[in-house]
């Protein structure tokens, strides 16, 4: 068991034994390789099942808002920011929340690993320091962590949690080191027609399962616009206008709020690079308005602030 | 062509090309971490090394969006409907896994029940689509077909079953259509009848591979002992009322990944879309994970939280469908939902929890149940 997992268990068991929380939201081992499962531990014995691996790729803030009671949540940098978000948006009271801060070395991308295995079945993955060892029935291959990290983790700007009631490890270097503005160059150098073509192509394989929406900790509407039936705002078909409208509106709902946690991209069964849209919003908020979402409980959300000298580029 | 034929593996592209005369031939193609059926292109070749396609092939017979009819709301044609022409092209899917073929056979029983309720769209596509299966020699960690009335070399739903023997491929006809197809293959390449010493060896190799594949599942911590037996003995109400459901649903995101990647999920929603003076009636996949799925016009929703919705999915697979289909589970064990669920809710664990809880549940009520879906 790794040091992070051991420490998470210690903290969770103590919090539960001392009855400081009703439940601890974290991960336990997945049933298959390259997976970890969200898990709600309610007793010290259950807390013994908690773990931490590079495959904790969901965003637990998503589940935290609906569980009720006093809750401790294991949170990396991005998840801690989304916890700030749900507190700010009155979906969870700060006094009911205990953040178990997990300094993050970046989560792993199971798809990148599968791609590198070219058809050979993976039976296990070991993480040691900067090395990731992938094993199969008759092979073992070692990769640098950076080679198989998720894209959003490579360019992460805040790996240390912004809230920390309990701490799992010493802080790690604050950023992932990659250039977060690289992805949006994809859009910026293109003419409108080419942008639209890229937009269309990006979401061509969407099956409208809404895993991206449901994995996202930002979504908070009681009834999502895609589920509105009277009037029905959006068609149900696989036709391009229906699919693209969904993705466009979903992305806009994340403007100024997206922490680039990558949960949407990890959840997508079709392997769609979801962040192509949301990273543009993140970048606009950061570069045009100097705003990074949910860095502190006091900061005002980007869309709640108006200044006469706000830039207009965002409309172009 | 009644008997199985052995072909060189190198001849498979030639056979596929021959089958492509007058038909669109689709094969599994892997790009990155995704595998999907794509039109066969001899220049790109094909690989027999893939686990299974990321999505099930059900959309070939049951498209996610399908126009059923068109209508006018104004003018002299107002109120008249025109059915959409049934224009299914002739197709051949090569490399369908036995679990997915079993799902087609199962869905036949949903869409083609009797003369009065046959779904013409499904039936025509099924009739015009030939299925050449590829036996599983190396099941994935998530596979459990052997626990779901299936097997890695099963032939249900297929026209031909192909078995990869390394340098050779064994093609076994299953249906009359498959026998005709095998005759076409024998014209395109040299096939050796699987009889005599050589045939016996090939059949023996196939058998060894089948047993090897079954052994993989038998060694899985999730498959042995997986059974619907206790669930089948309990009434619908008992299974419905088990205490296990809130905990199973707790981490569910209520997205539709499990239902949309499932080869047997077949629920749909029919909508009329009107623009100006005309419109169309269109059928789209729907998912029981969605709040909207059971929302009534009155505002009432009989499945108001994810607990009821999650329960519905597993009840449908393991209780309602067996009740409707003479005991056959509504799941074929392909493992896609296990692989794809963002929360890693594992249907094998859910069935085991249902099984254990059913064993210790108090006796069922004496009121007989009626199967519903």
Go through the PLM ranges and name each one.
Chain B
Residues 1-236:
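Iron-sulfur-associated redox domains of electron-transfer enzymes in respiratory
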Residues 104, 263-267, 342:
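Active-site-flanking alpha-helical
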Residues 225-250, 268-373:
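Ferredoxin-type iron-sulfur electron-transfer modules in oxidoreductases and energy-metabolism complexes
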Residues 248-259:
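Extended amphipathic alpha-helical segments enriched in small hydrophobics
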Residues 257-273:
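A donor-sugar binding/catalytic signature common to diverse glycosyltransferases
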